[in-house]
Amino acid sequence: MTDRYILAVESSCDETSVAILKNESTLLSNVIASQVESHKRFGGVVPEVASRHHVEVITTCFEDALQEAGISASDLSAVAVTYGPGLVGALLVGLAAAKAFAWANHLPLIPVNHMAGHLMAAREQEPLVYPLIALLVSGGHTELVYVPEPGDYHIIGETRDDAVGEAYDKVGRVMGLTYPAGREIDQLAHKGQDTYHFPRAMITEDHLEFSFSGLKSAFINLHHNAKQKGNELILEDLCASFQAAVLDILLAKTKKALSRYPAKMLVVAGGVAANQGLRDRLAQEITHIEVVIPKLRLCGDNAGMIALAAAIEYDKQHFANMSLNAKPSLAFDQFPDSFVIN
């Protein structure tokens, strides 16, 4: 059997990445050019800055990914690219590069949903068992997804306001922590105690929706009031209390989803899946079903996860033509207008 190689491109936010996947789940390379240092002084991602950085480094990422994988363009079977959701300018840079490369090398183009990529990152460490439920937690999304079979995604719950990663970054900014703040808050939380009371929005309600805006506002109000009154707050305890509230919400909704849908596996993915507190709680509280979390290097945005998701679409011969466009608000159940089934 001839080996299959997929080159994948990811540029939906502030990471420029190109990866090479061999067959179903072997990543030969996963080159990531991070922009974190450029955005730190702004306390968040500036779309125009992100787009310009993508343009500067994407060609080098292509070259490095192929060199690291030890193959040439003539060995490739397909090109995959994130076409949404994400920042429109950032998406267009990766999309233009992927389309040009695919056209020049006469390769089929596979459109990949960024969040499907996060979910399918778990495929690298072991085969996924269906049906499964996925908890996707990142800076832009918080979703519960039911996946009855490969490539078939159904959102069963999502945030009504802030994404969980967004809440981490916003409270981190209030505390004067470095962007992105999630890792530092997690580390501080492990040194503190849950002593401050924060709301757990909708935690007892019957639906599977999330809300983090009230928690974020309560945290900011507590911090500002204490500062105005000259009261000292213990940073470690603040982080521990905030994180305890976040994890209570995530675990409660995930358990409800598992009780309502026939699932053989739980996948937890996205940037916030790197959170050690979340990993610890999952290990302690969800023991009746296998929990799969991608390795730390695949939790953040990267093209490796896009390639792993693309392998599913390749098997189904789901390709797009060169009119494929960026979809910044792409939903899980939305297919590209240029979708072609061969």
Curated annotation (Swiss-Prot):
A GO CC annotation given for this chain: cytoplasm
Location of this chain's protein in the cell: Cytoplasm
Keywords linked to the UniProt accession: Acyltransferase, Cytoplasm, Iron, Metal-binding, Transferase, tRNA processing
Biological process (GO), any one: tRNA threonylcarbamoyladenosine modification
InterPro entries reported in the protein's UniProt record: ATPase_NBD (IPR043129), Gcp-like_dom (IPR000905), KAE1/TsaD (IPR017861), TsaD (IPR022450)
Annotated substrate binding sites: 136-140, 169, 182, 186, 275
Highest taxon above the source species: Bacteria
Disulfide bridge map: none
Any one Gene Ontology molecular-function term assigned to this protein's record: N(6)-L-threonylcarbamoyladenine synthase activity
Cofactor: how and how many bound: Binds 1 Fe(2+) ion per subunit.
E.C. designation(s): 2.3.1.234
CDD domains registered for this protein in UniProt: ASKHA_NBD_TsaD_bac
PANTHER family: TRNA N6-ADENOSINE THREONYLCARBAMOYLTRANSFERASE, TRNA N6-ADENOSINE THREONYLCARBAMOYLTRANSFERASE, MITOCHONDRIAL
Family: Belongs to the KAE1 / TsaD family.
Entry function: Required for the formation of a threonylcarbamoyl group on adenosine at position 37 (t(6)A37) in tRNAs that read codons beginning with adenine. Is involved in the transfer of the threonylcarbamoyl moiety of threonylcarbamoyl-AMP (TC-AMP) to the N6 group of A37, together with TsaE and TsaB. TsaD likely plays a direct catalytic role in this reaction.
Protein name per the record: tRNA N6-adenosine threonylcarbamoyltransferase
UniProt organism field: Streptococcus pyogenes serotype M6 (strain ATCC BAA-946 / MGAS10394)
